[in-house]
Amino acid sequence: MLFNRSLPAPAHPTSITTLNGSNLEYVDNYKYLGVWLDCKLSSQTHIKHLQYKMKSRISFLYRNKASFTHAAKHTLVKLTILPILDFGDVISKIASNTLLNKLDAVYHSAIRFVTKAPYTTHHCDLYTLVGWPSLHTHHQTHWFQVIYKSLLGKAPPYLSYWSP
């Protein structure tokens, strides 16, 4: 994949040959360690995949909602939906508000599943009902925790390499 932030899509390059003589395949999107990269280094592809993954899980939960108690719904969303949002949330630092609003909508849908709140319920009321922060606050808190751990020297090796 060649990265190019210019507006037109990059032309497919001539073949790139490795040291052992094999040709590399050109791809527009590539998943690396759970994060989707595209040739323009935008977060749109990653956010779309997150949105699809969360929607499919929430749909499954809604189809089987009669089988779950309130506590079970709360636990299921906490264990199946929230980790998707947490993994790779550093990408949200560079995402546009339009893309983040799409994740907010899915997050609100997950909260509505837990609380049985109608669609017209304001998002602030949803957060109060379930006792969770907004997605922005959640990501900001996680970001501050990463910075704090880095300062204490308890960051993962790939992050501590970049800290003083």
Predicted regions and their residues:
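Short, charged alpha-helical motifs in flexible N/C-terminal segments and linkers
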Residues: 1, 99-164
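Short, well-ordered loop/turn and helix-capping segments at boundaries between secondary-structure elements
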Residues: 6, 38, 42, 60, ...
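Short conserved micro-motifs at the rims of enzyme active sites and ligand-binding pockets
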Residues: 11-14, 44-47, 155-156
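Short intrinsically disordered coil segments
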Residues: 15-20, 47-52, 127, 160
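Residues in well-ordered beta-strands of folded domains
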Residues: 1-3, 18, 33-36, 144
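Short, conserved micro-motifs composed of acidic
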Residues: 1-28
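Charged boundary/loop elements
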Residues: 85-100, 104
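Basic, alpha-helical interaction scaffolds
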Residues: 21-91
